[in-house]
Every structure is written in structure tokens, then in C-alpha cells.
Amino acid sequence: MQPTPTQRPEAIVHDEKAQLDFARDMSYGDYLHLDELLGAQRPLSPEHNEMLFIVQHQTSELWMKLMLHELRAAIAAIQQDRLQPAFKMLARVSKILEQLVSAWDVLATMTPPEYSALRPYLAHSSGFQSYQYRQIEYLLGNKNAAMLQPHAHRADLLAQVRAAFEAPSLYDEALRFLARSGLAVPAGALQRDWTQPYRADDQVEQAWLTVYRQSERYWNQYQLGEKLTDLEDAFRLWRFRHVTTVERIIGFKRGTGGTSGVTYLRKMLEVVLFPEIWKLRTDL
């Protein structure tokens, strides 16, 4: 029995009536500005592996752009007591972080000798100088005035980073929402110097404990607490994979930006963004 001949590829496309002429129409590449996007990878070394290094960091910056978009929208929604949209946005941020965690697996295919060959071409450029990442840190509440300095050479970038530094963080707005819900949040947590890191407060923990003990009554508040927990959990995983990837590639050498490298990154693992939400789990 002879097999039925398959339809020619050209005929399939014709039958589907696919748009093929883009002389006067916007194409996929036009919409995404792919010429500019794919022209932005400009290795400085002759090393094959530099393309991996560049693409890893550029794609991370694109995901961070989306993170900032979602975080700012989530903060605005919480300010307006629009919790359902905020939940969707915060869940998306957590998923973006999962994507960024998995991306470390690709960079980890670079061996120590391969990185050492391209490292001299990086000069003092380092990931901690990322102005998008710094805004994310500030919006999540990890305020550090010293980290404004790497952006002082660009007034436009400094203005962006400073705006995030001086604004209430995601957690600050979450606490304000609890207060508007009738929960006993101390005034010191509601009106303070937003440029300072948040410090845990027993009264704030009591407010969150009330939410978790009466979750049916405070369902939106409870869901907000869990979305924040998801986000910080994902952020911690990203930080951890950052540490382990750097350690397997450069060991304990100093970072290109002048930090102690892995030692510095390990210190960042100790940062807690939403302290009472974690502590209440012990006290429930």
C-alpha cells in the first residue's frame, strides 16, 4: 500500500492565506524593532563565549524592565485599594523571577577559563551598576544611598534611580493598605523617611497576625501577604543562584565592580524585605 503523499509546504502556506508581503505592512521584525535589538550585541573580545555573557545580561535587563513595569503598576493599584489587579501583577513579577532564576543555568555553562579570557574586556562594568536592578531593589525596600553613586555620571539615570529611592516601597504601601483596612499599624510605619531601610516593628507583626488569624475577614490583606511572600521567596532564589553561579565561575576573586564578589553577594542573601510576614509564621 502506497503512503499518501503529503501536501507541499508552499501549498500549506497558500491554503492558510498567510500574509507574506510586507512591503507596505508592519512585519514582526518591524513591530519588535529587531534590527536595533539584535544589533545591540557588540562583543569587545575575540572570545566565542562573550556572546553568551552579553545575551544573558541583556535579556535579564529586558525582564527587569517588565518587572519595573509590573511593580510600579502594582504599587499604584494598592494605593487605590485595587487589590485584584495588584495580585495579578505581583504574581507576574514572581514568575519573571522564576524565569531569571532558570537563566542562570545557561550562564553556568561558561567555565572559569572561558570567563577569565573575556574578563579583562569588561573593565569595571558590573551587574550591581544596573540602574534597573537598583530601582527594583529600592521599590522592594532595600534602600541604600551609596548605590546612587554609580549613576551620578548620567543625570537622566540618576533621576530615575533617585525617584525610586525616595518613594515609598511596595511594603510601605502594603502597610498603608492595612491601616486603611482598620488594622492597628503604628504611625511610625506610615509616615517615615522613605529613603531609610524599613525596620521590623512588633505592632506591625501584630497587624499581620490579625490578618492571618482572621483570613476570611481580611481575605484581600491575607492574599496580599501571601503574594509578598511568593515574591520575596522567588527573589531569594534568584539571589542564591546568582551567588552559586558566580562562585562556580570565578570562585572568590573580587568582582569587576570592585566588590568582594561572592562574599558581597552572600551578604545580600541576609537582606529581608518583608520581615513581619516571615516572622509571623513562627508566632502563629
Curated annotation (Swiss-Prot):
| Subunit relationships | Homotetramer.
The record's family statement is: Belongs to the tryptophan 2,3-dioxygenase family.
Q: Which residues bind substrate?
A: F53, I54, V55, Q56, H57, Y115, R119, T256
Q: How is the cofactor bound?
A: Binds 1 heme group per subunit.
Record-level GO BP terms: L-tryptophan catabolic process to acetyl-CoA; L-tryptophan catabolic process to kynurenine
Q: Which organism is it from?
A: Bordetella parapertussis (strain 12822 / ATCC BAA-587 / NCTC 13253)
Pathway field of the UniProt record reads: Amino-acid degradation; L-tryptophan degradation via kynurenine pathway; L-kynurenine from L-tryptophan: step 1/2
Catalyzed chemical reaction(s): L-tryptophan + O2 = N-formyl-L-kynurenine
Q: Describe the function of this protein.
A: Heme-dependent dioxygenase that catalyzes the oxidative cleavage of the L-tryptophan (L-Trp) pyrrole ring and converts L-tryptophan to N-formyl-L-kynurenine. Catalyzes the oxidative cleavage of the indole moiety.
Listed EC numbers = 1.13.11.11
Report the gene name: kynA
Give any GO molecular function from the UniProt entry. heme binding
Its name, as the record gives it, is: Tryptophan 2,3-dioxygenase
Q: What keywords are assigned to this protein?
A: Dioxygenase, Heme, Iron, Metal-binding, Oxidoreductase, Tryptophan catabolism
